[in-house]
Amino acid sequence: MQTELDYIKETLTKRIYILFIEKYKGNKLQFAKKVGCDEKAIRLIFDKNQGMTINLFFKIASALEIDPSELIKDLKINK
């Protein structure tokens, strides 16, 4: 199960990163301000594969102007 969770976190982070690059051209400070968090939090998510709270996840989705469900589409834990 942990392997699946790690895969989900990695995939979600990649999806967010791709949209971040498209919308914010790699400007982590601008993105962090729009999200409402520290730039350090954004760096940790992207560079260190740090997890995120559900609140931060929704703020990130809002800053990327995407429905949160689109970011997690097709991500699931197999039984």
Map each language-model feature to its residues.
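Short, basic, alpha-helical segments at the C-terminal edge of helix-turn-helix-like DNA-binding modules
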Residues: 13-16, 59-63
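Short alpha-helical DNA-recognition segment
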Residues: 23-44
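Short, basic-rich loop-to-helix N-cap that marks the start of a DNA-contacting helix
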Residues: 49-61
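Core residues of bacterial helix-turn-helix
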Residues: 35, 63-64
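Residues within the helices of the helix-turn-helix
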Residues: 17, 29-30, 58, 69
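Short, charged recognition helix plus adjacent turn
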Residues: 1-7, 44, 72-79
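A short, Lys/Arg-rich alpha-helix, primarily the initiator
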Residues: 1-26
